[in-house]
Amino acid sequence: MGISRDSAHKRRATGGKRKSLRKKRKFELGRPAANTKLGSGRVHKVRTRGGNTKLRALRLETGNFAWASEGVARKTRIADVVYNASNNELVRTKTLVKNSIVVIDATPFRQWYEAHYVLPLGRKRNPKHAQKEDENDVLTKKRSEKVMKKYLERQKYGKVEQALEDQFTSGRILACISSRPGQCGRSDGYILEGKELEFYLKKIKSKK
């Protein structure tokens, strides 16, 4: 039997059974779930009603994630699926769906932050390493007074909350997928911050 999105198979409001009046129709069809997994990208095109197409992602490993408080987005690698409100099975099988809580690589965001504010973010304090730092390092690079004035002005607004900074130190940050990988073929989302981050950290901790 094909997957159907009709209501002909449902019982009446009174609880009585309905008699089938016709066969299934093309416009009532449903398709199996994509169950997008973590892995090197594999996206299929699906022809839909009206000759339109959907992009069915079967495997994805990267996504475009937004850092809302800083107004910046970067493409980064998805490392793991850690929480899903609807189903624990989706966490165990590392399935990417909308609203999955995932762990992403923090490097692109750290690089942007350090270049934008000239402030260290998530760097382990190591004096030996500090001596060996080369001149190409964004933080130690020589700048004119005029340019430095601009950065000092920016630094007033460059505060990152403690919970997020701790994640940057580990090199992994929690994010939420807001796109639908099985429909648009992408796993884009946003970095968790504030109360939302607090909520999910508590949830993940209680599961362990």
UniProtKB/Swiss-Prot annotation:
Location relative to the cell: Cytoplasm; Membrane; Nucleus, Nucleolus
Molecular function GO terms recorded: structural constituent of ribosome
Keyword Ribonucleoprotein: yes
Keywords: Cytoplasm, Lipoprotein, Membrane, Nucleus, Ribonucleoprotein, Ribosomal protein
Signal peptide interval: none
NCBIfam families: eS8 (TIGR00307)
Protein name: Small ribosomal subunit protein eS8
